[in-house]
């Protein structure tokens, strides 16, 4: 069974389908899975994807279906959410961080409200690359109409700062491709024009989405979860390394809650054993030089010097939980003071102002709303654009958000 090893050697890419309801996102997911199943020998059917199981991410229940498939180049983990609210929640909580997305737009209808909304969301939560699939092309006899829809989608993408003219477009029919594969499971490339459009789409995705940067290649960062002092050796901060790598002897910064300080790593421990280097994903204890136990606390981060700065004011995109999801039962107003749970700690902050997601001003925020808000924290903490946070009140999560802009 040498085959399993081969699968793991390909880079993993996280991808998802976005677009207006009923434009064929789930059908396309099923068509890709079926068409590429000759690589893996397994595919997921439409109804398996559509009746997605519930998952919990940051205290919010999300229905997401995970489908895996591979091309010659990459191994894909694909997320499809059946409900529109699930998309919003999935993208904001980062339950699945996407390296790229396939925007599905019906060639027969053109862009619709959720097409715009998903492009906007993709921009706000930092989906870096989009490839477009114009679905239901079998219903459009006129080439010019197809070109018109493509132009409309390009303009929409450019409006939200995606490079519309560079983004690859493929027109096809997910349904007809799916039917062709169902009727002839051994169908090869070149034997059916609709199945070929699925191959063309995946070629474009392979080419256009670059290999994701591995977490270990990024600047080192670890959120402090706990602090101990070891007699005769000094202070140890423990936590899980979020990204990057770190070695004994490296200089690092302690950021957040107080003045930023520099220190040197004098030891690394994992599972009671010492190690020379720790990588992203490791749960470690970091021994730091010249730092008292009282100088460092949960909620601070240890980071590569200059890689992250403390802030108190930021803008964020927030999904407010419904009562059924365990959120608030009543609306809140400007001046609301909840706790913001960032990485490992709660910091009190004020929600100064907010607008609803379409940019109109909102007087109050109802459970289930999606808003843009400005938050002012009482202590500076290490935050950066694209970072996830939860809003909590009395220990329960009332909202989930992503930082869209740092103000100060």
From Swiss-Prot:
Domain tr-type G: 10-213
Catalytic activity entry: GTP + H2O = GDP + phosphate + H(+)
One Pfam family recorded for the sequence: GTP_EFTU_D3
Key word GTP-binding present: yes
Positions bound to GTP: 19-26, 80-84, 135-138
EC number(s) from the headed UniProt entry: 3.6.5.3
Record keyword Protein biosynthesis present: yes
Keywords tagged on the record: Chloroplast, Elongation factor, GTP-binding, Hydrolase, Magnesium, Metal-binding, Nucleotide-binding, Plastid, Protein biosynthesis
Spans annotated as G3: 80-83
Stored InterPro entries: EF-Tu_GTP-bd (IPR041709), EF-Tu_GTPase (IPR050055), EFTu-like_2 (IPR004161), EFTU_2 (IPR033720), G_TR_CS (IPR031157), P-loop_NTPase (IPR027417), Small_GTP-bd (IPR005225), T_Tr_GTP-bd_dom (IPR000795)
UniProt GO cellular component terms: chloroplast; cytosol
Enzyme class: hydrolase
Positions of region (G1): 19-26
Region annotation (G2) ranges: 59-63
Positions bound to Mg(2+): 26
Alphabetical list of SUPFAM superfamilies matching this protein: EF-Tu/eEF-1alpha/eIF2-gamma C-terminal domain (SSF50465), P-loop containing nucleoside triphosphate hydrolases (SSF52540), Translation proteins (SSF50447)
Record NCBIfam families: EF-Tu, PRK00049.1, PRK12735.1, PRK12736.1, small_GTP
Protein name: Elongation factor Tu, chloroplastic
Gene: tufA
